[in-house]
Amino acid sequence: DRLRSRGLGDVYKRQQFAYRYDTQLLIDRRDRDLDEDEIADYITENFEGNSLIAAGDEDLVKIHFHTNEPWKILEYCNTVGEIYDIVVEDMIRQAAGQQG
């Protein structure tokens, strides 16, 4: 593959992903009055990224966000409530056929 032999394939993949890490987690809301819209607004206003989903039911709020700094999202969400089922996947590695 000509692109791969020159290293341009990696450059192309990096350009496809403005935000490298797919960050997903759940926040336990059983003991707290959490508003997923307020959480989404805070994330949007304070962190760089895209593809935000903040949705929930009476027990939890699910967060999904693409960012280059997933630890900041985890740190913030941990101040809001107990976080669990944390998944951080490297989308560039996944696009290259590797484990994310």
What are these regions (language model features)?
Residues L52-A54, G81-A95:
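Conserved short beta-strand edge segments in small beta-sheet-based binding/regulatory domains
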Residues K13-R30:
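Short glycine-/aliphatic-rich beta-strand segments at the starts of folded cytosolic domains
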Residues D10-Q16, V88-G100:
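Long, charged amphipathic helices and adjacent flexible linkers at domain junctions
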